[in-house]
Amino acid sequence: MPELPEVETVCRGLEKLIIGKKISSIEIRYPKMIKTDLEEFQRELPSQIIESMGRRGKYLLFYLTDKVLISHLRMEGKYFYYPDQGPERKHAHVFFHFEDGGTLVYEDVRKFGTMELLVPDLLDVYFISKKLGPEPSEQDFDLQVFQSALAKSKKPIKSHLLDQTLVAGLGNIYVDEVLWRAQVHPARPSQTLTAEEATAIHDQTIAVLGQAVEKGGSTIRTYTNAFGEDGSMQDFHQVYDKTGQECVRCGTIIEKIQLGGRGTHFCPNCQRRD
């Protein structure tokens, strides 16, 4: 599933491929992906110019002439740009045709991805309604606010980090990596964390996601960037998908449990429950 680093990588790729292009027509083969009014979506997009790209958490943002297209890739969503006629592909569901003859294609094997069209003035309200936390940066991710939110919750720290309210952009892969680096057990109730542990999680969230952006994201199964290239962050994972291997820090065998319905990897020695 694309998490913040993967979405940021897609965003940066699309910036190089489609900025300034004018949409001539749109073709939607799976209408359920469009979560705002379908007729308005089809009517408003032609003649819009893609002015810039952006990202908020795991949401990809297309800033158009007077609209914003919000795209969530969910589990398997991908964008591919074809300068000429694109090939017929089984899992291609939305086609943005440009005046210069190019086409941007949205592909999604699972069909879980979503698209919404808003006026820019409603963007802040949209993300407030999603209860989306701050971006994982030094400027936006306030440690004291984070500690205060943890102190009020009995949720397991992994589940809490995944719900996007504490900080935006973490998913299953990077939560496991952050908690391993911070040496915190994923099932620990949030309110039991010490100030030192909360600080470690805060700092490692910024560090891990920053490193993952630098490495172009993680390719575990099918993720590729807008150029069809794999990321390399998977080569730097220390715990995710390492079940049965030795912890590089202490030599203990990495274990996998189910937590909140999610496969969860941790070191039982470095990340003690009590």
UniProtKB/Swiss-Prot annotation:
It catalyses: Hydrolysis of DNA containing ring-opened 7-methylguanine residues, releasing 2,6-diamino-4-hydroxy-5-(N-methyl)formamidopyrimidine; 2'-deoxyribonucleotide-(2'-deoxyribose 5'-phosphate)-2'-deoxyribonucleotide-DNA = a 3'-end 2'-deoxyribonucleotide-(2,3-dehydro-2,3-deoxyribose 5'-phosphate)-DNA + a 5'-end 5'-phospho-2'-deoxyribonucleoside-DNA + H(+). Binds 1 zinc ion per subunit. It comes from Streptococcus pneumoniae serotype 4 (strain ATCC BAA-334 / TIGR4). Its EC number is 3.2.2.23, 4.2.99.18. This is Formamidopyrimidine-DNA glycosylase. Involved in base excision repair of DNA damaged by oxidation or by mutagenic agents. Acts as a DNA glycosylase that recognizes and removes damaged bases. Has a preference for oxidized purines, such as 7,8-dihydro-8-oxoguanine (8-oxoG). Has AP (apurinic/apyrimidinic) lyase activity and introduces nicks in the DNA strand. Cleaves the DNA backbone by beta-delta elimination to generate a single-strand break at the site of the removed base with both 3'- and 5'-phosphates. GO terms for biological process: base-excision repair. It comes from the Bacteria. InterPro entries: DNA_glyclase/AP_lyase_DNA-bd, DNA_glyclase_Znf_dom_DNA_BS, Formamido-pyr_DNA_Glyclase, FPG_cat, MutM-like_N-ter, Ribosomal_uS13-like_H2TH, Znf_DNA_glyclase/AP_lyase, Znf_FPG/IleRS.
